[in-house]
Structure formats: C-alpha cells, structure tokens
Amino acid sequence: MPKGLRRYYGKGHLHFITFSCYRRLPLLKRARARDVFVKELAKLREELGFQLIGYVVMPEHVHLLISEPQRGAPSTVLQKVKLRVARKLRKRRKSAPAGQMRLPLKECGEPLGAFWQARFYDFNVYSEQKRIEKLNYMHANPMNRKLVKHPKDWPWSSWGFYTRVGKVLVQIDV
C-alpha cells in the first residue's frame, strides 16, 4: 500500500470515505445512475450490517460516513458497492431498447476500461466534532460545486434526513 494510505480498522471509529469514478469522469451525472448507487448502498447496509451515518453521491465521486460493518471491513463495503454499481450501470447501457441510441462508457473516443478509480480515501472519525464537520462538508458539496442552490435540491445525500426536509432515499443510522 502506498505511503500515507494506511487504514485503521477495529477501533470502533466511524469512517469518512471518499472514492471517485475512473479519471474523475462524471459517470454518475445522470439521476438514474445516482439512484442505482443509492439502492445498492441500501442493500449492502442490510447485508453487511454497517451503520450509514451520512452520504452524498456527486457526478464523479461519492462521500460516505459509515461504521465498521459487522461482516468484513469498510474496504469490503467499497469493494461490493463499486462492483455492483459498475455492473448494473454497464448492463443498463448494453440493454437499451432497439432503436434507442446507446452511448458506450468512453471519454474522448477512448474505451473506458474501468468505472471506478482503484483507491479510496478513508479518514477515521474519532470525535463528535469530526462527525459533524464531515457531515457538513459532504452536505455542502453539491452547493459548493454549483449543482444546486440549496442542499434540499440534491436528493442524493443524507441532508434530508438530518433536517427532516425533502426525500430520504436510504435509511440513515444515528
């Protein structure tokens, strides 16, 4: 593992995880793609037994704030969610109805070899102050990127759960 990418598991901390689409391409720019991600995340939450404290799905990256799962490690969650989402979204593109134009996963005329970047960033959240800091950071992300004017307008985050405003797409644990 490269220097500076150590992972600390087994301490009971929450994990603030960031991972990106391949080459930071906006492969999650469509609402349908973000919906697929959220559905798969909800399924894995149940299967692996981790607590989902917060999340935001952006067009080219994702932030999660999770506990360590009962089965596996946070890296197991990432491995499974990345695999499932990539398979579903690639399958969807291949199975477009006859007569409908299908755009391959490619950028600049070059075939796309991967859906996700191989690595991910994992920060141990060891205090309530850090938990709030990371939640505020992720919930502000769509506004900071000028995708929306207010977090309530970006349903692919846990902001609606904490404010009780808007739609909650996946159950949040507190």
Q: What is the role of each PLM region?
A:
Residues 1-174:
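Short catalytic/metal-binding and nucleic-acid-binding patches
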